[in-house]
A protein has these predicted regions:
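ATP-binding N-terminal substructure of ATP-dependent carboxylate-amine bond-forming enzymes
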Residues: 1-107, 111-114
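Active-site nucleotide/adenylate-binding loops and adjacent lid/helix of ATP-dependent enzymes
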Residues: 107-194, 198
């Protein structure tokens, strides 16, 4: 759904997720004159403490999503693991940024790498997909030392294992229960940059 911009102070903004980032968003939005409604399954998440309304429903609850859309002029998400289909449903009735299609890419490290390389044409660390034990034998030796990362639901070091050899890789993949992964060559970092575009 299209929304005329800018949004005027006094309008309500929706936030999918009620953690610390949602809390910071709600505080800054209040300073700018906006009201925030948070949809978060938890009973008293950090963002709810500083928001006008808290909808305590699962992210895929039709009732919760419809209430959020009805109460707000625009909706965003505080993290990439909100179900993309929830954002797609919201977008039928309210402006949503980022869209569900972008979040779906950000939720999967393999899709994200492919997008960054082939669409954005930005160089990335050497990598390969590991989705089965048979993929381990095909890994080039030049990829080691590396980091094995779960393709989904990993953040802040969770779902990541340092590996120095094919044997380490096999053990690490097994320890991650054989879920879809990405193996990235370990590189020396000189700088890390985080960018948010509004």
């Amino acid at each position: 759904m299209q929304k005329k911009f800018p949004l005027n102070p006094g309008e309500a903004l929706g936030m999918m997720g009620g953690g610390q980032l949602g809390r910071m968003f709600a505080i800054e939005a209040a300073y700018m004159g906006y009201h925030v409604t948070v949809l978060e399954p938890g009973e008293l998440p950090p963002a709810a403490e500083v928001s006008l309304h808290h909808i305590a429903r699962p992210y895929l609850s039709e009732e919760g999503l419809d209430a959020l859309a009805a109460d707000t002029a625009a909706v965003s998400t505080e993290f990439e693991n909100v179900p993309a289909q929830a954002l797609d449903r919201l977008a039928q009735n309210v402006f949503v940024a980022p869209p569900g299609s972008a979040v779906a890419v950000a939720q999967d490290r393999n899709r994200e790498k492919h997008f960054i390389e082939s669409v954005a044409h930005v160089p990335v660390a050497p990598h390969c997909r590991i989705s089965a034990q048979s993929d381990i034998e095909a890994v080039e030796d030049s990829l080691f030392p590396a980091i094995l990362k779960t393709a989904r639901l990993g953040y802040d070091g969770k779902g990541q294992v340092l590996v120095d050899s094919r044997q380490d890789l096999a053990r690490a993949f097994e320890s991650l229960h054989g879920v879809d992964c990405i193996l990235e060559k370990r590189l020396k970092l000189f700088k890390e940059v985080s960018v948010i575009v509004a």
